[in-house]
Amino acid sequence: MPDSVAGMTAHQITLGAFNLEAQNPALLAGFWAAVTGATPSPGGESVYLPASPGGFAMFFQPRTAPRPEHQASHLDLTVPWGSRQAEVDRQVGLGATFQWNVLEEHPHVQWTTLADPEGNLFCVAEHPPADQQ
C-alpha cells in the first residue's frame, strides 16, 4: 500500500470531529461542553462543539435510526497520572453515570468507564510515569 495518495501522507491525517447521533443533540452537546470546556455552536437541529487546544471537536446530530444494542466504539479521555478519580467525580457531577473501574489488569493504564446522559460509554484513563510501569 502506498505511503501517499495524491500528495497526502498518513502523518497528515488528524481527527476532524467525533460524531454522535443523539435523541437530544443540544442536551448532549451541553454535557460534553461542560466536560471539555468548549462552547457549543448550534446549527439547526445539530450542534458543533469546536476543539479546545489539544482536544478534539464533536458534532451532535439527531438520531436517524434506533440506537444499536452494542456500542462499536467509544472515546478514551486521558488525564494526568493521579487525577483520574477527581476527573471521574467531576464528570459524574456533570451528569455522567459510573459503570466500572479497570485498575489492576494493565500495568500501563488505569481507567474508569462512564456513560454520558444518553448512555454512550466513554473512559477516563491515566497512564503511570514510565518509571512506575
PLM features: residue spans?
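Vicinal oxygen chelate
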Residues: 1-23, 40-42, 48-61, 66-90, 92-133
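N-terminal first-folded block
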Residues: 25-44
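Conserved active-site tyrosine of GNAT-family acetyltransferases
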Residues: 28, 32, 91, 119
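A solvent-exposed interaction/effector surface
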Residues: 36, 44, 61-64, 68
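Short amphipathic alpha-helices in soluble, non-transmembrane regions
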Residues: 33-35, 87-94
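Short acidic, gly/pro-rich beta-turn/loop elements at beta-sheet edges
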Residues: 30, 68-70, 85-87, 122-124, ...
